[in-house]
């Protein structure tokens, strides 16, 4: 991604992305400014992991969003003609209930907020809303791409594959504010993908982080300060599921879920055969 493209995407994101049900209607996005990123630093820590438990995962699931709720995993899977919203038994990996998206929709990020599930789509500009029992509860329209999705105590939080993360009103889908995330050397940290809000931080999977122009390190998650976009650290998950990664270069890490009651953290990837409960710890 060139500098001009990054700059253009940033301007476009802040000016137009936060629309409501009518993408052609007026909204307040033009008044929203991204929070300035702190001065670049080279002291960003890297964390590693310990596998606590391993669970089965559907190897056909092109995981794009993952959420833990009431002892079940809820998953958004992607690919045209294959995308689903599903409820999964954690221990067995069995799909308990599933809703298939239309063939023209590519499922993306997923979260649960205000007793509703929200599921983004990639380039279709549609967010699907479901009740807690997975029955449809409506749709919202937005401009731009949808990648990762999480929430804080007030807003939905959306990534679009750039280094911009937006905070969006769940009722109107208008952008309330936005942050930009830079690497420790000051360059944009692009390809921010699946998101999870954990203990006051945004954890963002970095899609294809192994690419030199992205990060040059495989299977990394960024820890981000939601107040200002400051990069708080990386989680190095390289080597966690080598067999899955070797099967296809697109079988990338892409699924983070958190159980706040027990502080369990779960990760998986696209078409991975396993889901991992991990403990994050400082890297020695």
Locate predicted features.
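Conserved beta-strand positions in repeat-built beta-propeller and related beta-rich domains
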Residues: 75-79, 117-124, 158-162, 204-216, ...
């Amino acid at each position: 991604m060139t500098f001009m493209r990054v700059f253009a995407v940033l301007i476009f994101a802040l000016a137009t992305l936060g629309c409501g049900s009518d993408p052609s209607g007026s909204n307040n996005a033009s008044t929203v400014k991204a929070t300035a990123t702190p001065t670049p630093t080279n002291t960003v820590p890297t964390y590693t992991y310990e596998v606590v438990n391993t669970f089965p995962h559907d190897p056909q699931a092109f995981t794009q969003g993952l959420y833990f709720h009431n002892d079940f995993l809820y998953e958004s899977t992607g690919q045209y003609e294959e995308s689903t919203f599903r409820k999964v038994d954690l221990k067995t990996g069995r799909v308990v209930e599933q809703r298939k998206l239309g063939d023209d929709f590519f499922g993306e990020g997923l979260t649960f907020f205000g007793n509703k599930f929200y599921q983004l789509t990639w380039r279709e500009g549609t967010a699907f809303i479901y009740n807690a029992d997975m029955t449809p509860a409506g749709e919202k329209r937005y401009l731009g791409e949808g990648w990762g999705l999480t929430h804080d105590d007030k807003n939905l939080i959306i990534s679009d594959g750039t280094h911009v993360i937006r905070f969006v009103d769940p009722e109107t889908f208008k952008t309330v504010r936005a942050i930009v995330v830079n690497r420790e050397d000051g360059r944009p940290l692009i390809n921010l993908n699946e998101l999870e809000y954990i203990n006051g931080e945004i954890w963002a999977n970095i899609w294809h982080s192994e690419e030199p122009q992205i990060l040059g390190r495989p299977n990394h998650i960024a820890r981000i300060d939601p107040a200002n976009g400051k990069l708080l650290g990386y989680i190095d998950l390289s080597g966690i599921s080598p067999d899955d990664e070797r099967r296809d270069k697109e079988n990338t890490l892409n699924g983070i879920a958190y159980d706040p009651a027990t502080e369990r953290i779960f990760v998986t990837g696209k078409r991975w055969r396993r889901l991992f409960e991990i403990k994050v710890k400082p890297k020695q």
